[in-house]
Amino acid sequence: MVRNTSSVKVRRMTHDDLNEVNQIDRQLFGENRVPTWPFSFDTYWNIYGPGVSFVAEINGQIVGFLAGTIVSQERSQSVIDMMHSAQRASRYPKIGYIDMIGISKQFQGKDVGRALVNAFHEESKRSGAITRAHIKESDETLSRFLSKMGFKKWETVTYEKD
């Protein structure tokens, strides 16, 4: 599956892309990343494999990535997901989670993120899933981006205690 948005080409991520994806991840978040996802892309790949992951290319160079998963809601143990299922059980039997997204700094603001999210959302819809992203409340840039993409804040907030 390949999608083009102006000069941005989006395709499924492969194992051969990992080196370039890890370079983007380290460029954005350093070796000790924590923004929304607490571990490196390498670790994500080792746990989840390719999942529903995409890369964006401009002139043959990988300039961004999106990693996600699509899961059946009835298999989820989360009360949040059960609540969502009860409200929309027949319409959305699955959830497509955007787990990680990263765009090289020099290509941010050039529709790369939009192309990646659109590709993931299309795949989610084909699978009968609603698309969801969990982000840190303090990540104003990602929050604005998701709002521009048509995402709406949902009613729950997660609290955590060490």
Model-derived features with residue positions:
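Conserved beta-strand-loop-alpha-helix junction that forms the acyl-donor binding cleft
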Residues: 105-108, 132-143, 160
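Conserved acetyl-CoA-binding loop-helix of GNAT-fold acetyltransferases
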Residues: 103, 109-122
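Glycine-rich phosphate/pyrophosphate-binding loop shared by adenosine-nucleotide-utilizing enzymes
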Residues: 8, 60-65, 96
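Conserved GNAT acetyl-CoA-binding A-motif
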Residues: 95-96, 124-137
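Conserved acyl-donor/pantetheine-binding loop and adjacent beta-alpha core of acyl/acetyltransferases
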Residues: 67-100
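Conserved active-site alpha-helix within GNAT-family acetyltransferase domains
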Residues: 114, 126, 137-155
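A short beta-loop-alpha structural element at the N-terminal edge
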Residues: 6-23, 34
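Active-site rim helix/loop that mediates acceptor-substrate recognition in acyltransferases
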Residues: 32-59, 67-73, 87
